[in-house]
Design a protein with these regions (language model features):
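A short macromolecule-binding patch
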Residues: 85-95
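A short beta-strand micro-motif
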Residues: 54-58
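Mixed-charge, Lys/Arg-rich low-complexity intrinsically disordered regions
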Residues: 2-53
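Short aromatic-glycine-enriched beta-strand elements
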Residues: 72-79
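Short beta-rich binding modules
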Residues: 3-5, 15, 75, 112-117
């Protein structure tokens, strides 16, 4: 279940229910028996569901999240660009814009999964 609520500032935010988070985690990690397979499962979910590119701010600077990458250490990163500059930022640390892009609930599920391992 996805819930939409209003913050004190009147902005809406979407929260995913625990049952839906569990379903998403299961979908991303089904048949994944090691860290490499789990990372590949999550990466696949982002490729299928996350609408790219999208704009956000990193340290107060506007950037474009152009793509998602998978590092050799199995860390999933957002490839952020600004002009000719590129920077990989962990999805765990990536600030999401408001409103969030379509598919951003997969980032929330990924963060939840990482916190529970």
């Amino acid at each position: 279940m996805t819930r939409t609520s209003k913050s004190r500032e009147g902005k809406s935010s979407t929260r995913i229910g625990k049952a839906r988070l569990a379903e998403m985690i299961e979908e991303a990690t089904v048949d994944a028996y090691d860290e490499s397979e789990q990372a590949t499962g999550w990466f696949t979910m982002f490729e299928e569901h996350l609408e790219l590119p999208f704009e956000t701010k990193v340290l107060g600077t506007a950037v474009t999240v152009a793509s998602i990458g998978l590092r050799g250490d199995y860390q999933i990163v957002a490839i952020c660009t600004r002009g000719r500059d590129r920077q990989a930022i962990s999805l765990v640390d990536l600030p999401l814009p408001s409103p969030k892009p379509a598919g951003a609930e997969w980032i929330e599920a990924y963060r939840h999964w990482l916190g529970g391992r």
